[in-house]
């Protein structure tokens, strides 16, 4: 089902992603979009393999236990087990935050795997099961014969997807910047900057380098 801007009545949505944890960029975008949909009166069922973190009572989560040990086999298992759940419910839209078959809408948080693989690896890499799995997932979303509508967060992504999969341009929808207001510099940012420099004895002509690593 394609995107139709005039459809403003309450919808029943399925949100699908492989894993949720509160510190991932994709996952944070997922949660912001989910809360906005709830605010507008839509209902959402979430399907995932794993959920780490608190749950919203208005956001029911179905955990699907995949088979297999490797990531690509587990994802294949998740997609296969997901289909009966989607068939049992009259969903208006199936929205994916990872590349997988059967999506009406895909939120493109990841870059083009095909472009990255060909730039970083030789031809031998394309023989691996992992490569074949990830390309098949991309084709299921971006192939010219598919109907999935694509929400982009970067215009630069579109060229690669169109190059490798001949995706029609009209299926791409560029989203505005989604920076949270609490991440924007406040009106007293200059005062805070001066106070921080005084606290750590940093002169006006000196730079402070802050190195951050995440290992959640």
Where are the language model's segments positioned?
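Helix-loop-beta element that forms the nucleotide-linked donor phosphate-binding surface
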Residues: 158-187, 200
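Conserved donor-binding/catalytic core segment of Leloir-type glycosyltransferases
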Residues: 151, 203-216
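Conserved donor-binding loops in enzymes that form glycosidic bonds
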Residues: 18-20, 177, 211-216
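Active-site proximal beta-strand in glycosyltransferases
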Residues: 95-96, 100-131, 151, 174
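A short helix/loop element that forms part of the nucleotide-sugar donor recognition site in Leloir-type
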Residues: 185-202, 208
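N-terminal strand-loop element at the rim of the active site
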Residues: 3, 17-23, 36-73, 85, ...
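Membrane-proximal helix-turn-helix segments that form the acceptor-binding/catalytic region
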Residues: 130-153, 158-159
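An amphipathic, basic-hydrophobic alpha-helix
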Residues: 68-94, 131-140, 210
């Amino acid at each position: 089902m394609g995107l139709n801007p005039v459809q403003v009545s309450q919808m029943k949505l399925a949100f699908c992603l492989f894993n949720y944890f509160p510190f991932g960029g994709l996952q944070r975008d997922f949660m912001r979009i989910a809360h906005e949909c709830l605010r507008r009166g839509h209902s959402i069922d979430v399907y995932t393999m794993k959920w780490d973190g608190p749950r919203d009572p208005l956001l029911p989560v179905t955990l699907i236990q995949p088979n297999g040990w490797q990531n690509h086999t587990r994802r294949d298992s998740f997609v296969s087990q997901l289909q009966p759940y989607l068939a049992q419910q009259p969903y208006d839209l199936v929205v994916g935050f990872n590349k997988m078959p059967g999506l009406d809408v895909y939120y493109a948080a990841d870059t083009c795997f095909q472009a990255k693989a060909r730039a970083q690896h030789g031809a031998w890499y394309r023989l691996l099961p992992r490569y074949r799995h990830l390309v098949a997932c991309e084709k299921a979303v971006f192939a010219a014969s598919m109907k999935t509508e694509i929400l982009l967060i970067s215009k630069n992504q579109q060229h690669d997807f169109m190059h490798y999969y001949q995706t029609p341009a009209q299926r791409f929808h560029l989203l505005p910047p989604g920076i949270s207001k609490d991440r924007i510099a406040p009106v007293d940012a200059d005062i805070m900057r001066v106070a921080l420099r005084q606290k750590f004895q940093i002169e006006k002509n000196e730079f402070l380098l802050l190195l951050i690593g995440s290992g959640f």
